[in-house]
């Protein structure tokens, strides 16, 4: 799965619909269906919830990551959050719900238990150490999520800094998945600067294989998360 951001002509984060469509076209031309393309709906201090929702509803992408706290806003309301997420699921958009701490996870579980967010093939992302000193992650940051995760949703982690690979190993050992790469970290596990994004991905691959975790194909991902 490729996690995709785009930027405008000034290098700023963008949710431009046509920009995303062009980026998806270029990637598809290169890899065909052998990769799942997950776009971001991230606010990045630029967009508000209505604009984020409008962009994703217009795009109807193959997959998207959505920060729960970014869309769970008073001007959207619980009903609006439910309509948005449930609508994506009905259209077989693979939705990864980003949770920054255990409070986000508890809020997600509350929305699920009360039926605001309906049953679907949701995928959770636990963000480790987002608000730690120096934004450096530790495997210990996973424990509050594991202690509170009561649902059946599969989950992944992302982490910051040189301990990224250790966090990935911890997640893999507990049955989780991982988002890895330059978005959150530039360092290899030995503390050296990674020469490219591939180096970080390969670290994660070798770690998973050492723990007996097989690598998913694009077809595997689409089947597990209800893709089209």
Provide a role label for each language-model segment.
Residues 44-50, 128-134, 187, 224:
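Flexible glycine/acidic-rich beta-alpha junction loops that bind and position SAM and/or redox cofactors
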Residues 11-77:
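Active-site beta->alpha loop and helix N-cap motifs at the rims of alpha/beta catalytic domains
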Residues 11-41, 84-92, 143-152, 198-212:
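Alpha-helix-loop-beta-strand connector modules within alpha/beta enzyme cores
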Residues 2-4, 37, 64, 178-179:
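Hydrophobic residues within beta-strands of alpha/beta enzymes
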Residues 202, 206-228:
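Mid-to-C-terminal alpha-helical segments outside catalytic/metal-binding sites
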Residues 63-183, 193-195, 199:
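Catalytic alpha/beta core domains of metabolic enzymes, predominantly
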Residues 1-23, 127-129, 185-190:
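Glycine-rich, proline-tolerant flexible connector loops at the mouths of alpha/beta enzymes
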């Amino acid at each position: 799965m490729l996690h995709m951001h785009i930027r405008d002509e000034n290098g700023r984060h963008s949710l431009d619909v046509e920009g995303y469509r062009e980026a998806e076209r270029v990637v598809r031309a290169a890899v065909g269906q052998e990769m799942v393309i997950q776009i971001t709906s991230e606010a990045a201090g630029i967009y508000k919830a209505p604009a984020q929702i409008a962009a994703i509803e217009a795009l109807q992408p193959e997959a998207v990551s959505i920060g729960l706290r970014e869309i769970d806003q008073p001007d959207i309301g619980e009903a609006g959050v439910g309509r948005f997420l449930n609508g994506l699921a009905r259209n077989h958009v693979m939705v990864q719900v980003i949770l920054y701490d255990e409070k986000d996870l508890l809020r997600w579980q509350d929305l699920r238990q009360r039926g605001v967010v309906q049953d679907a093939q949701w995928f959770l992302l636990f963000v480790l150490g987002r608000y730690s000193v120096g934004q450096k992650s530790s495997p210990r940051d996973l424990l509050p999520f594991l202690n509170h995760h009561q649902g059946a949703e599969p989950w992944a982690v992302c982490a910051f800094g040189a301990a990224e690979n250790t966090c990935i190993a911890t997640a893999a050992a507990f049955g989780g998945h991982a988002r890895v790469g330059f978005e959150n970290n530039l360092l290899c596990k030995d503390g050296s600067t990674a020469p490219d994004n591939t180096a970080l991905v390969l670290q994660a691959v070798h770690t998973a294989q050492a723990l007996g975790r097989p690598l998913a194909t694009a077809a595997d991902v689409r089947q597990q998360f209800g893709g089209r």
